[in-house]
Amino acid sequence: MADWDKVNSVWSAMEANITAVGQNILLRLFEQYPESQSYFPKLKNKSLGELKDTADIKAQADTVLKALGNIVKKKGNHSQPVKALAATHITTHKIPPHYFTKITTIAVGVLSEMYPSEMNAQAQEAFSGAFKSICSDIEKEYKAANFQG
């Protein structure tokens, strides 16, 4: 079970730095899963060094983290934003659902590195539980849509 209050407490502390956090998450995703970069049209075919401080990665970082933040702030009552997120990723972006698990796992690691005092063991467990819940609900949407990607 996710401790949504703990997750939101850390999220609030991080929000002022959302672009940098998002950049670090995306760069780590691309480093660990290079094939994932192909799902971001403005970011594909560029080296990590080229991407590091571009306007494109900053914009994508904001988009990704703000969408995730909108879901996190629902404290588990996130069916509407999850449905909307899944719908665009199924029909427009065609991103396989396992990438949500990958990026949220990376997010826990990046947050732990960037906010070590806030991301203690309890907070890491809370985020892992929250992200597991979110990813599970996203996967249900993919299954309902019979995603073949």
UniProtKB/Swiss-Prot annotation:
SUPFAM superfamilies named among the record's database cross-references: Globin-like
The keyword Transport appears for this protein: yes
A GO cellular component entry from the record: extracellular exosome
Residue list for modification N-acetylalanine: 2
Keywords of the record: Acetylation, Cytoplasm, Heme, Iron, Metal-binding, Muscle protein, Oxidoreductase, Oxygen transport, Transport
One Pfam family, short name: Globin
Transmembrane segments: none
PROSITE patterns: GLOBIN
Subcellular location: Cytoplasm, Sarcoplasm
Record field: catalytic activity: Fe(III)-heme b-[protein] + nitric oxide + H2O = Fe(II)-heme b-[protein] + nitrite + 2 H(+); H2O2 + AH2 = A + 2 H2O
Function: Monomeric heme protein which primary function is to store oxygen and facilitate its diffusion within muscle tissues. Reversibly binds oxygen through a pentacoordinated heme iron and enables its timely and efficient release as needed during periods of heightened demand. Depending on the oxidative conditions of tissues and cells, and in addition to its ability to bind oxygen, it also has a nitrite reductase activity whereby it regulates the production of bioactive nitric oxide.
PANTHER family: MYOGLOBIN
Assembly and interaction partners: Monomeric.
Official protein name in the record: Myoglobin
